[in-house]
Amino acid sequence: NYREGYGMFAVNGILFNHESPRRGETFVTRKITQALANIKAGKQKYLYLGNLKSKRDWGYAPEYVEMMHLMLQQDEPEDYVVGTGEAHSIEEFLDEAFGYADMDWHDYVRIDPRYYRPTEVDFLEADISKAKKKLAWEPKVKFSELVRIMVDADLELAGLDTPGDGEKIFKAKFADWHRWEHQV
């Protein structure tokens, strides 16, 4: 192993999908929450997506940063998988996001073959057992909470009222709700 051979303190974090309101707008989670806000604001009519059955292990990005810091605080360097240990489909994300906003995604989502990936991986789920066992780490933010945080942030960015659960979840588990805002 390279790090042992050269006596280096080096760790690898194998990070599964990590999301937040800062996520780029072309990534499916942010594409969904931003489109939801735009639809509610009357700026957009439909959201075009590809494979809704694809499943991913989506976690909350700030927690992954905390995990990376924790990995670096250990006496011995090791590699860790960082994720939630749960996989959810894009359809589940739509159900959660639009349901939270009292909307039916079926009214707004259109399937567009252009968004199907030729080499789509249908299922990705992290095995976080080593992180749980050795570092006593597991994510605090659950899937539905992550979605609510992201929906509230995009509704707020669009100047709309939010249901408010996202902010409550964030404040209960972290600190300043406006920490996600882009700095100008």
What is each model feature region?
Residues 16-19:
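Proline-glycine-enriched beta-turn/loop adjacent to the NAD(P) cofactor-binding site
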Residues 11-13, 80:
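Hydrophobic/aromatic beta-strand patches that form the interior of the parallel beta-sheet core
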Residues 23-184:
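C-terminal substrate-binding subdomain of Rossmann-fold SDR/epimerase-dehydratase oxidoreductases
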Residues 1-11, 33-41:
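Active-site Tyr-X1-5-Lys
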